[in-house]
Amino acid sequence: MPTYRRPLNQQQRDILALLARFRFGTCTLFSQSLSTSLRYTHERLRILVEQEYIGKRYDNSYKLAGRSAEYYLLPKGIAMLAENDIASPKLVKLLAKDERASDRFVRHCLSILGAAAQLKSLYGKNLQFRTRSDYAGNTLFPQPLPDGYAFIESPGTEERTHYFIECFDGTMPESVMRATITKHIEFYDNDNWESDTRYPSIVLICRDERLKTKVEKWVQKAVAEGWSDNLHFELLIVTP
């Protein structure tokens, strides 16, 4: 007789939806993002792995490095999201590659999810966070697209405070990080921001205090060489 499996509950579906947007996650990051306990989050992940909705990256090297298990979508989970119009055909193709993703890509995805959780803890539950998969093809934003876009809408008004998020997590060379800072300054200086709203504040997520100090100097130098003093940069430390 086939084994009966209970349908997924909403909390398990929420984990799958997060993986569709952020690609990878850990038990701690899921717990923070969904405001659930580590114990219950771990149990939900165990069931999703057991039922082959998600895969798990973990071996002895993780334990030695004090690194948490990392989770990603498997074909069964991707298919369920596609059937419910949560994953577009283009996103489905990208998600199918995650089982073979590089360590560098995984770490960057975890940094973005960590940034989203940290920003919600700082700015409250009204903050909405979007990833590249949410705004793929958007020509209003600078290119390459920022790692994230977040906004807060004031209740009862159309006023919006918004942010571009860039994660400097040790997965890219210094030249790329500097170019990312310059990208925003040049985009703004060249009047490419075609919106009536103010250009979003740029939040640079740094992996540690040492990098944050470096980035602060790069920002000061790049702003001094640009045309406008109206851009606002904010630096935060987030460790996934």
Over which residues does each language-model region extend?
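Nuclease-adjacent, charged terminal/linker segments that flank catalytic cores
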Residues: 1-94, 98-99
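A short beta-turn/loop motif at secondary-structure boundaries
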Residues: 60-65, 137-141, 196
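Active-site metal-binding core of divalent-cation-utilizing nuclease and nuclease-like domains
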Residues: 102-109, 117-163, 171-179
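Active-site nucleotide-donor binding segment shared across nucleotidyl transfer reactions
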Residues: 112
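C-terminal regulatory/effector modules of DNA-binding transcriptional regulators
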Residues: 154-240
